[in-house]
């Protein structure tokens, strides 16, 4: 399985929620995820890890070759990493607001026209994220970037120039430019990074929340020419990356937060030939209109389909469709 994951293939991805790493019920453990899943992004409970969580993650990384990445919404410098004593005691420390105290700790300037100081502060924050990933042993970072859908705003994401400082610093340690083999991925709305498209070259994967897409046409538009939820990825990044590379780095995902959808494999979907199926299968079968191979497919709250028979039946089937093998990944 570890050798398979080193090959050039369409990957299986999932956001995992409710992680505890313990208990007889494997729904809350990474060890219960199919061996053939390539990348798991921890959606919550991803810091202050217990001994059980550390062992659970190490088992999947070392025995299965699964990449475990940490997911976080990105907004402003200091989010989730500002020391608690500053958040609790900013008034006693003489600051006029919590935000003023946060900015002081991270040396973020009150005058944003001082772009050099802005850059230094943003890079300091990015390095703190790297330190956190290293502390817990993660294989990479999943940036939840949703400036419109959230909307998640802040002094990093509100300006593409600021976002570039952040991504460029992360890119020294993660992603295709780093040479480390560690992952830097972005989910949500990467297609909206229109004023500095070179940011796109720093990511291993663009992970698109193509929830309830309904058809091949919807996925084609999200990838190529847009008009579904902003521009297409190729529209945004095509000036700095080849269409083939963009396509090979694109993972389409379905929302399994609703248990009935998870158990059923998603929502109604019709391919370009008129065949009807559920959406996760449709994504797996989808061959992009441009003729290039996609990066893969995934699910949000992947753990919600643990209760299928066999467990994780739908993602197993999607993997088998994308990467046919001589033996089925579905258990008998």
PLM feature segments, named:
Residues 1-332:
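Secreted glycan hydrolases and related glycan-binding modules that recognize and/or cleave
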């Amino acid at each position: 399985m570890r050798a398979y994951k080193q090959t050039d293939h369409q990957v299986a991805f999932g956001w995992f929620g409710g992680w505890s790493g313990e208990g007889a019920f494997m729904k809350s453990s990474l060890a219960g995820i199919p061996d053939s899943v390539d990348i798991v992004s921890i959606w919550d409970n991803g810091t202050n890890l217990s001994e059980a969580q550390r062992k659970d993650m190490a088992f999947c990384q070392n025995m299965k070759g699964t990449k475990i990445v940490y997911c976080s919404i990105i907004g402003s410098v200091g989010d989730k990493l500002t020391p608690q004593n500053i958040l609790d005691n900013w008034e006693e420390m003489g600051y006029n607001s919590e935000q003023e105290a946060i900015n002081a700790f991270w040396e973020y300037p009150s005058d944003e026209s001082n772009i050099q100081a802005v850059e230094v502060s943003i890079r300091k924050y990015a390095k703190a994220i790297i330190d956190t990933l290293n502390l817990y042993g993660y294989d990479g970072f999943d940036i939840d970037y949703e400036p419109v859908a959230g909307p998640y705003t802040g002094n990093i994401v509100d300006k593409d120039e600021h976002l570039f400082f952040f991504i460029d610093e992360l890119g020294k340690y993660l992603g295709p430019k780093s040479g480390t083999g560690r992952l830097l991925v972005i989910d949500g709305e990467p297609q909206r990074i229109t004023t500095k498209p070179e940011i796109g070259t720093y990511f291993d994967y663009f992970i698109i929340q193509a929830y309830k897409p309904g058809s091949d046409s919807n996925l084609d538009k999200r990838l190529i020419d847009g008009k579904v939820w902003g521009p297409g990825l190729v529209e945004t990044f095509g000036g700095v990356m080849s269409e083939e590379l963009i396509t090979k780095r694109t993972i389409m995902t379905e929302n399994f937060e609703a248990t009935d959808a998870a158990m059923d494999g998603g929502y109604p979907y019709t391919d370009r030939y008129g065949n009807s199926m559920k959406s996760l299968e449709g994504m797996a079968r989808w061959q992009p209109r441009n003729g290039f191979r996609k990066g893969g497919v995934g699910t949000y709250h992947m753990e919600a389909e643990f209760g299928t028979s066999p467990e994780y039946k739908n993602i197993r089937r999607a993997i088998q469709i994308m990467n046919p093998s001589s033996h089925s990944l579905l258990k008998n």
